[in-house]
Curated annotation (Swiss-Prot):
Extent of the CXXCXGXG motif repeats: 143-150, 159-166, 181-188, 195-202
Gene that encodes the chain: dnaJ
GO biological process: chaperone cofactor-dependent protein refolding; DNA replication; protein refolding; response to heat
Entry's Gene Ontology cellular component terms: cytoplasm
Taxonomic lineage: Bacteria, Pseudomonadati, Pseudomonadota, Gammaproteobacteria, Thiotrichales
CDD domains, per the entry: DnaJ, DnaJ_C, DnaJ_zf
Keyword Chaperone recorded: yes
Protein name: Chaperone protein DnaJ
Length: 374
């Protein structure tokens, strides 16, 4: 039996941040928890799936293996049973607020770094070909002066308020849950000689320069995840991730819609009448387009596979060129005389013979007038 996608189980995208995954899990776990659905086998199965998905996607190492190899990369790592490792609602609150056991203590002492976001503006050409960009971001990194301890002497004293747990147990109505210790801010220890460089935080803000590979075909709003390039974790915990959001600059010629490109192509009055070849710019060079005689404004020519590459396959979009017939301007007296002779040569049956759109329009006007005055 084919296993369900963990991302689909939690109703999140594959680029979802840790915060988004946690929020989605909490909502679903509260909805399908067996304590809320006694005797409901389907809810119990759903809760097991949700718990299994969260255990994998909330762990950076397991999530990375899952993204690379699918279920095969994590099946041997995940042993699930019962209700996915949760007893009652208190266990769910422990997951998000910390617990009174050694497990909660470990979480309070080791905290994963925060995820960061960066907006990167690129050109349509860069999105077409793909590009490597260099960016500089501010992020929190471990303090070199105190090796991340926050202490000059690199020594720590157990917090007297929480006794090293990092959390203090609270009772609210029927629920008992843990809150971060306000004395030590969840670290489980206190510092008597704070480091002069980081003021006891163990972290300092630094500028980090990174190279980001932008794949060809990337679109507005796409996010690229750089694992481990977010803020530094505390006490040996993993770093957060960096999410680079792509913004594509407006182009002077082309408009993008999904994987297709669109443009308006001005042609001369004579070229529209007589036809001929014209050079059309594309993102990867000029191409020659054959304009058929008697081409009208609004006609669209499709250039196959001259659009953007699809990120989700090997398809490439098309370039659609809309014709705009330009009316001549700044005419000399001689040119105007020639045009008048040309107009006279068309004769009285000009509309019926030489202007099909004009004929249709006037016919519609006449029909409308008849109905209006009848």
């Amino acid at each position: 039996m084919q296993q369900k996608c963990y991302y689909e189980i939690l109703n999140v995208s594959k680029t979802a941040s840790g915060v988004e995954i946690k929020r989605a899990y909490r909502k679903l776990a509260m909805e399908y928890h067996p304590d809320r659905n006694p005797g409901d086998k389907e809810a119990e199965i759903k809760f097991k799936e949700i718990s299994e998905a969260y255990e994998i996607l909330s762990d950076d190492s397991k999530r990375s293996r899952y993204d690379q190899f699918g279920h095969a990369g994590v099946n041997q790592q995940s042993g699930f049973g019962g209700t996915g490792g949760f007893g009652g609602f208190e266990d769910i609150f422990d997951t998000f607020f910390g617990g009174g056991t050694s497990r909660g203590s470990n979480r309070s002492r080791a905290s994963r770094g925060s995820d960061l976001e960066y907006t990167l503006e690129i050109t349509l050409e860069e999105a077409f070909f793909g590009v490597e960009k260099e960016i500089t971001i501010p992020r929190m990194e471990s303090c070199d002066s105190c090796d991340g301890t926050g202490s000059k002497s690199r020594s720590k004293t157990t917090c007297h308020a929480c006794h090293g747990q990092g959390t203090i147990r609270r009772q609210q109505g029927f629920f008992a849950f843990e809150q971060t210790c306000p004395v030590c801010n969840g670290t489980g220890y206190s510092i008597t000689d704070p480091c002069d460089a980081c003021y006891g935080n163990g972290k300092v803000k630094k500028q980090k320069t990174l190279k980001v590979k932008i794949p060809e075909g990337v679109d507005n709003g796409d996010r690229i995840r750089l694992q481990g390039e977010g803020d530094s974790g505390s006490n040996g915990a993993m770093n957060g991730d960096l999410y680079v959001q792509i913004i594509i600059k407006e182009h002077k010629i082309f408009e993008r819609r999904d994987i297709n490109l669109y443009c308006e192509m001005p042609i001369s009055f004579t070229k529209a009448c007589l036809g001929g070849d014209i050079k059309v710019p594309t993102l990867d060079g000029e191409v020659v387009l054959k304009v058929v005689p008697e081409t009208q404004t609004g006609k669209v020519f499709r250039l196959r596979e001259k659009g953007m590459k699809s990120l989700r396959g090997h398809r490439r979009g098309d370039l659609l060129c809309k014709v705009v017939v330009e009316t001549p301007v700044n005419l000399s007296a001689e040119q105007k005389e020639l045009l008048e002779k040309f107009a006279d040569s068309l004769g009285e049956d000009y509309q019926s013979k030489h202007a099909p759109k004009s004929k249709t329009w006037f016919d519609n006007v006449k029909d409308y007038a008849k109905k209006f005055f009848e």
